[in-house]
């Protein structure tokens, strides 16, 4: 099940959001918001209050003369209760 949550995202924006108890992950494209909430609550033992998702546009990549695209992904911003935290980001 945790294979569906690919990895945590560490960027300037995600570091700012950690102060507001919002954590950022890249997840499988097929997951829905209720499934993401269930996965995060079950794996990290926290209470999720909100789940925001977005799918950034795909980016072109050149390999020699051929033009390809980077794989698509879904980015999730999960808000948890104020008195809790996720230890991965600590």
From Swiss-Prot:
Superkingdom of this protein's organism: Eukaryota
Localization per Swiss-Prot or TrEMBL: Plastid, Chloroplast
Quaternary structure and interacting proteins, as annotated: Part of the 50S ribosomal subunit.
Cellular component terms (Gene Ontology): chloroplast; ribonucleoprotein complex; ribosome
InterPro entries: Nucleotide-bd_a/b_plait_sf, Ribosomal_uL23-like, Ribosomal_uL23/eL15/eS24_sf
One protein family per Pfam: Ribosomal_L23
UniProt entry tagged with the keyword Lipoprotein: no
Annotated family: Belongs to the universal ribosomal protein uL23 family.
Keywords: Chloroplast, Plastid, Ribonucleoprotein, Ribosomal protein, RNA-binding, rRNA-binding
Lineage, top ranks: Eukaryota, Viridiplantae, Chlorophyta, Ulvophyceae, Oltmannsiellopsidales
Alphabetical list of PANTHER family matching this protein: 60S RIBOSOMAL PROTEIN L23A (PTHR11620)
Role description: Binds to 23S rRNA.
Official protein name in the record: Large ribosomal subunit protein uL23c
Biological process terms in GO annotation: translation
Species of origin: Oltmannsiellopsis viridis
UniProt signal peptide: none
GO molecular function terms attached to this record: rRNA binding; structural constituent of ribosome
């Amino acid at each position: 099940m945790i294979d569906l949550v690919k990895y945590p995202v560490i960027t300037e924006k995600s570091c700012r959001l950690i102060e507001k108890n919002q954590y950022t992950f890249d997840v499988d494209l097929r997951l829905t918001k209720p499934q993401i909430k269930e996965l995060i609550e079950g794996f990290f033992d926290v209470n999720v209050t909100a789940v925001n998702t977005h799918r950034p546009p795909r980016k072109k990549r050149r390999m020699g003369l051929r033009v390809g695209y980077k794989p698509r992904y879904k980015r999730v911003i999960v808000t948890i209760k104020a008195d809790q935290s996720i230890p991965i980001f600590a």
